Amino acid sequence: MNKRRVIYEGKAKILYEGPEPGTLIQYFKDDTTAFDATKKAVLDGKGVLNNRISEFIMTHLTSVGVPNHFIRRLNMREQLVRKVDIIPLEVVVRNIAAGSLSTRLGIPEGQSLPRPLVEFYFKNDALHDPMVSEEHIAAFGWATAQEYDDIIALALRVNDFMSGLFAGAGIRLVDFKIEFGRWFENDHDMPRILLADEISPDSCRLWDAKTGEKMDKDRFRRDMGGVTEAYAEVARRLGIIRESGEETDNVIHFTGGSK
């Protein structure tokens, strides 16, 4: 068997060379990290769930006109994606105060924000992904002025769609992190900005609309337990998997309790 060529390996995913020019295979690992990878664990079945959830959301975003790198799911852990040149920025959209926003500004966790906030962080693990401004982005050439405007517009469109999607499933979209890349279609000189990476409970804060229970990676960060179970509950509410947990024997019903 020919060994696939690894293009990039991150904390939660591996990118392999794709079967066709301009494509990659994105593999979702069970590895879970927090606090700049100082906290680590392997959670059985997490990669399967993130693959399915990200596929579901990216497919729906395509249907509402948000261009992204997703092509199709290949199997339980892999999907075929377009190869893009990643812009070295993490884009965070916030609807409710939580995480670093509460810490930095002293805003109580759970307070609704007057409007969605879009923040940018420079992708650099060694520097702990520092927050940057539009001036930094322009000065260091991380994105052009037009790309910056496109990213803001796309991020807010993603937020509008996902807020409604999750609200229909009884979930509040607190905030989320996304990434974008430049896609050179047919070797054209002008690249197109595409949503890339993934959208899953690893990259979103999701709270139960009635109880406020956390259904995302904060369960791992805060040692609450039930991480995979919470991700499975998100998938069930979105209609991705059946109540029985068809994708993995490691997925069981999420009760909201700690373990």
UniProtKB/Swiss-Prot annotation:
Signal peptide: none annotated. It catalyses: 5-amino-1-(5-phospho-D-ribosyl)imidazole-4-carboxylate + L-aspartate + ATP = (2S)-2-[5-amino-1-(5-phospho-beta-D-ribosyl)imidazole-4-carboxamido]succinate + ADP + phosphate + 2 H(+). Pathway: Purine metabolism; IMP biosynthesis via de novo pathway; 5-amino-1-(5-phospho-D-ribosyl)imidazole-4-carboxamide from 5-amino-1-(5-phospho-D-ribosyl)imidazole-4-carboxylate: step 1/2. The keyword Nucleotide-binding applies. CDD domains: SAICAR_synt_PurC (cd01415). It is an enzyme of class 6 (ligase). One of its GO terms (cellular component) is cytosol. Keywords: ATP-binding, Ligase, Nucleotide-binding, Purine biosynthesis. It comes from the Bacteria. Belongs to the SAICAR synthetase family. This is Phosphoribosylaminoimidazole-succinocarboxamide synthase. It comes from Hyphomonas neptunium (strain ATCC 15444).
